[in-house]
Amino acid sequence: MDLKLLNDQGQAATFSAPDTIFGRDFNEALVHQVVVAYQANARSGNRAQKDRAEVKHTTKKPWRQKGTGRARAGMTSSPLWRGGGRTFPNSPEENFSQKVNKKMYRAGIRSILSQLAREDRIAVVDTFGLESPKTKLAVAKLKSLGLDSVLIITDAVDENVYLATRNLPHVAVVEPRYADPLSLIHYKKVLITKPAIAQLEEMLG
């Protein structure tokens, strides 16, 4: 698969990327499963509701059992009552995780990268570095490359690059092992350094 190789001025040449990573067919069902599982595994239980034993209430019987003409009632904490406990309350201990084995996950990443390559959303650079940790420098460099919303995958995250880009809402810098499926499809473009492609091939090939 041929990808764009950009220089510092944004001029493009051709880079021959391995087909084992960037030349696979797109498997929509697999990618959907991998992305949904990734989102589910990142989810933490933050919903809490009270059952009838946890709501604040009195144990006094609201009225006598017989003779009033009303339906019998034992406690105001009953789920049938307004202000009563939930029958099946949500709990912070809920487990939302979904299992995706390594083979499927890697195949999903390969499928995403291949589709991004076909859509011309991947570009390659020799290296990506900055002289100092200045956001202004990072913005100028990305502008010269014609990029705004971009995921930068580099073999080793340079401290200057990390500090300069961490305040940019549409830019993220990661190493190949941290390139997750959600980030790959979230950003408009993916910028990969040559050494990072070698690492991806070693990880996913």
Swiss-Prot record:
Any single biological process term in GO: translation
Record bears the keyword Magnesium: no
Residue segments, region Disordered: 43-96
Protein's UniProt keywords contain RNA-binding: yes
Keywords tagged on the record: Ribonucleoprotein, Ribosomal protein, RNA-binding, rRNA-binding
Gene3D superfamilies reported for this sequence: 3.40.1370.10
Extent of Basic and acidic residues compositional bias: 48-57
Transmembrane segments: none
SUPFAM superfamilies reported for this sequence: Ribosomal protein L4
GO-annotated molecular function: rRNA binding; structural constituent of ribosome
A GO term from the CC aspect: ribosome
Basic residues bias spans: 58-69
Biological role stated in the UniProt entry: One of the primary rRNA binding proteins, this protein initially binds near the 5'-end of the 23S rRNA. It is important during the early stages of 50S assembly. It makes multiple contacts with different domains of the 23S rRNA in the assembled 50S subunit and ribosome. Forms part of the polypeptide exit tunnel.
PANTHER family per the UniProt record, alphabetical: 50S RIBOSOMAL PROTEIN L4 (PTHR10746), LARGE RIBOSOMAL SUBUNIT PROTEIN UL4M (PTHR10746:SF6)
Subunit structure comment from the entry: Part of the 50S ribosomal subunit.
Family label: Belongs to the universal ribosomal protein uL4 family.
Protein name: Large ribosomal subunit protein uL4
Classification lineage: Bacteria, Pseudomonadati, Pseudomonadota, Betaproteobacteria, Burkholderiales
Gene: rplD
